Design a protein with these regions (language model features):
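Haloarchaeal acidic low-complexity proteome signature biased toward cell-envelope/secretome components but also
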Residues: 1-10, 28, 50, 197, ...
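ATP-binding N-terminal substructure of ATP-dependent carboxylate-amine bond-forming enzymes
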Residues: 1-102, 106-107, 133
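Internal nucleotide-binding/catalytic subdomain
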Residues: 159, 163-254, 258-260
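Peripheral (often C-terminal) accessory segments that flank ATP-dependent C-N-forming ligase machineries
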Residues: 294-387
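A conserved helix-loop-beta module that forms one wall/lid of the active-site cleft
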Residues: 99-161, 166-167
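Active-site "cap" helix and flanking loop/linker of ATP-utilizing ligase/carboxylase catalytic domains
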Residues: 236-253, 270-319
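A short beta-strand motif that forms the metal-chelation/ATP-contact edge
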Residues: 196, 263-273
């Protein structure tokens, strides 16, 4: 039986960006306190968390301090050092969820794909890359183009380089600047994602989201995805198979390709709340952030039932160069029924930096996802980033 006391449990979060901020916002109504560790003073999460430890993500002293102040540790960024977290968890007795072993698997995309393929999860053909000849061999086997990926350090599309021909192999490899892998290019109908939650002896999945990317950056998520019922069920099956491989409680963002012939292939996994799940704050009974809080604490999971069709659009830094973050012309968002603005509190705007998002939910029975998408795009276009 779950019991609350005052003060309630404390979650220590490695990372203090927008995900940590929204975790802290979801934790507060449950009586749960959050302390974050982040190298940036006054990071977005620090504005709502109980406290911030200013330290690098792999700083052993900082993570030890975090562990000693928390009942459980989690992370909102894959740059967390799994070896440091594992060692400090063992020394302090503060559990980590998801487990550091899962973080280790996720850190290296080649290791990730091999483990998932061995478990029967459908993935695009791939191979390790030691030199440009490996890329050329992949083009021989898979056809052009292929996708070159940095094995470590890449997220939000960073470190992904399409290679159009053998002549481009050398330059592409130099641009990745580190260990790499290459995948066949997937001819997809749409990109989708399942936000899945692993709790104590229970699993939950949120409604399938359809994702629109530009320049490898998520722009929009549309829910429910415009996929067939059969494809949707297959996506859930693949997500559950992925959770079997992952070790530890928490939310997992599982990105998938829906191919033109109706198959589902795994793209990538994030062992944390995911940008393509931000819509759940308004769109479902329990948000992905509250689910993560519940899951890592070992509490019962909440309902993932859809409240209404929903569209989320990111607010990306529409600036030429870095400068103070100011968002203008937000009146239309504030005046639109069903629209919700989330501003992350980042002090500096940079080109294409995720500064916030807008969610639009159906205001009536006649609102289709296409109508909501049009509204969301209009609202995103109306705001301005001011110098």
């Amino acid at each position: 039986m779950t019991t609350l006391r005052t003060p309630g449990p404390t979650i220590g979060v490695v990372g203090g960006g927008q995900l940590g901020r929204m975790l802290a916002e979801a934790a507060a109504p449950l009586g749960v306190e959050v302390v974050v560790l982040d190298p940036t003073p006054d990071c977005p999460a620090a504005l709502v968390a109980r406290d911030q430890i200013v330290a690098d993500f792999d700083d052993e002293a900082g993570i030890r301090d975090l562990a000693e102040r928390a009942d459980i540790l989690t992370f909102e960024i894959e740059l967390a050092d799994q070896n440091v977290m594992d060692r400090i968890s063992e020394e302090t007795g503060t559990p980590v969820h998801p487990k550091p072993s899962t973080l280790e698997t996720i850190h290296d995309k080649l290791v990730q794909k091999r483990e998932l393929e061995d478990a029967g999860v459908p993935v695009p053909p791939f191979r390790a890359v030691d030199d440009a000849d490996d890329i050329r061999a992949a083009i021989d086997d898979y056809g052009a183009p292929v996708m070159l990926k940095a094995r470590t350090g890449g997220y939000d599309g960073r470190g992904n380089v399409p290679v159009e021909s053998k002549a481009d192999a050398e330059d592409a490899l130099e641009s990745v600047a580190g260990p790499a892998m290459v995948e066949s290019f997937v001819d997809f109908e749409r990109e989708v994602s399942v936000i899945a939650v692993k709790g104590d002896d229970e699993v939950a999945t949120f409604p399938l989201g359809e994702n629109v990317h530009e320049d490898e950056i998520l722009r929009e998520t549309i829910v429910p995805a415009r996929s067939s019922e059969a494809v949707t069920e297959r996506a859930y099956d693949v997500a559950r198979d992925v959770l079997e491989v992952m070790d530890g409680r928490g939310v997992y963002g599982i990105e998938l390709f829906e191919t033109t012939d109706g198959e589902i292939l795994l793209n990538e996994i994030a062992p944390r709340p995911h940008n393509s799940g931000h819509w759940t704050i308004e769109g479902t009974q329990t948000s992905q952030f509250e689910q993560h809080v519940r899951a890592v604490l070992g509490w019962p999971l909440g309902s993932t039932a859809l409240r209404s069709p929903t569209v989320m659009t990111n607010l990306l830094g529409d600036v030429e160069e870095e400068g103070p973050a100011q968002l203008g012309d937000i009146d239309e968002i504030l005046e639109t029924p069903g629209a919700s603005l989330h501003w992350y509190g980042k002090h500096q705007a940079r080109p294409l930096r995720k500064m916030g998002h807008v969610t639009v939910t159906a205001d009536g029975d006649d609102d289709s996802v296409d109508d909501l998408l049009e509204t969301a795009r209009d609202l995103e276009a109306a705001v301005t980033f001011q110098p």
